[in-house]
Each structure stands twice: as structure tokens, then as C-alpha cells.
């Protein structure tokens, strides 16, 4: 019996429908296992439930409402000065941090020459120094910091930034734990060369404890860059802005300027103008 066109179309239609049903069944089976493991790592370190904190943020003594943003004061940040020997001291402190940061992501280094020192030292009344006499001797001929550019990142979550997530984020931005128990961004991602800027805990006492980082949390951190400081401050400032934005974006924070106002594009441009004005004044003084 000869099969006509109609019969052929029916057979082909049945085959196509069977193929579609089989493909859908195969995809459903394959998708069951995948959905179980598609977790967002950026939320792995967030708290299981909201926590309230009554920690006092740097600044004059005050009673804080836990539902309000913490008050920051750039005057309580550690004072800074250039110090050519700080890189050697930082190497010892960095070994302490190596236990907590395995397999750190590597990024490109900032393209600066390596002939000028610049690092930050603590103010004696805020951060006790084991060798204050030696520090005074080393710093007596170094220019004092005249201006500080501050960018604070405040957590929108009342539980604050959790230690492991915060540590991972800033390591990815090239900051390394070092002098004064705070983090510094050197011109090299490996932690070598002059310091471009630093990051301190904005909640007293202003430091980080890597030995207890798993239980650490803070409502805010402050990035700061001193002038005079890095030899190319505008480039260093751009790196600092990028690090602060990355932290705010990935850990749900909000950028604030040194007046506790929301950081805007106009604010960032104003900071850059402050750098230009400082360089102009410094050049005028050298010529005079």
C-alpha cells in the first residue's frame, strides 16, 4: 500500500512532537541539580538576622540612635606623615594577616616610580606606640600632613559590615593590613612601594583585629588620603574612590564625604580641585 502525502505529514508531525517532549524532559532533569547550587557568594557572609549595635562612632561623645547613621569625624582619624621605614614594619604585620587571606585575587599595580616614601603614622593619644621616642626621631624632619581627603562608607544594614566579607572585598581592591592595625593601599598590589591611601575602622578604637576577624563587624569604615602624601595624588585619589565604590556596591553601603553628606559626582570633583589647589600652592612655595 502506497503512503500518501497526508500520511507522511502525520508521521513527521508525531516525530517532531516526540522530539520536543523528550528535549523538554531532558532539560527539566538536568536543571534540577543546577538550581540547588546557584548561590550568590556576595551574600554568604551576611547575618542570619538583623543585629543592633550601640557602638560609638569616632567623634565627640554622643548618644546614638541605632536607627540613625553613625556620626563620623575626620578629626579622630589617625594623623599621617611620610615615613621611609614603614614598609619594613608593615612586612611583619602583614605576615599576621596572611593566615586569614589565602588565594587573594591579583590585580594590576599602579604605575608609579619608587623613589619617594610616603606612609601614615599614628597619633600617640589615639594609637599607643611601643617606641615613641624612635618614631619622633624618625619623623622630625618629615613634612606634616596639611590636608586629609576622607571618604566614609556606612553600612545600610544595622548589623554592619561583617569581617570576612569586608576583608575579602578590600583585599580585592589591593589594600593590605599593616602599620597601626589598619589597611593601606600601596602602589603595588603586593604591598610594596609608597602608600597611596589608608582605610581605618570608623568605629572606636579605629583598628581591625585580624585574629578575630570572623566575629568582627563595623557600621562604617573611612578611606583617607593625606596631602602631602603620594607623589601623584590625583591618580591615588581615583584608586581610593574606586575602592570605596566597590565596597559600597558589593556590601550595601553608602558613600559619605568629610562633612557627613552623601558623596556625589560634584563632591568627588571638588576633592580633585582641592588636590589641584594643594599642588599649585606647593609649587608656588618651592619657587618662592
UniProtKB/Swiss-Prot annotation:
Name the gene: zipA
Gene3D superfamilies per UniProt: ZipA, C-terminal FtsZ-binding domain
Keywords of the record, alphabetical order, are: Cell cycle, Cell division, Cell inner membrane, Cell membrane, Membrane, Transmembrane, Transmembrane helix
The alphabetized list of GO BP terms reads: division septum assembly; FtsZ-dependent cytokinesis
Which compartment or compartments is the protein found in?
Answer: Cell inner membrane
InterPro entries in alphabetical order: Cell_div_ZipA, ZipA_FtsZ-bd_C, ZipA_FtsZ-bd_C_sf
According to the UniProt topology, which residue ranges lie Periplasmic? 1
Q: Which cysteines are joined by disulfide bonds?
A: none
Q: Which residues lie on this side of the membrane: Cytoplasmic?
A: 23-288
Q: What Pfam family is a match for this entry?
A: ZipA_C
Organism of origin: Pseudomonas syringae pv. tomato (strain ATCC BAA-871 / DC3000)
State the name under which the record lists this protein.
Cell division protein ZipA
- Answer whether the UniProt record assigns the keyword Cell cycle to this protein: yes
**SMART domains xref list:** ZipA_C
What's this chain's function? Essential cell division protein that stabilizes the FtsZ protofilaments by cross-linking them and that serves as a cytoplasmic membrane anchor for the Z ring. Also required for the recruitment to the septal ring of downstream cell division proteins.
Compositional bias, Basic and acidic residues, is annotated for: 64-77, 85-105, 122-138
What's the family? Belongs to the ZipA family.
**Disordered: region residues:** 48-138
Q: Which GO terms describe its cellular component?
A: cell division site; plasma membrane
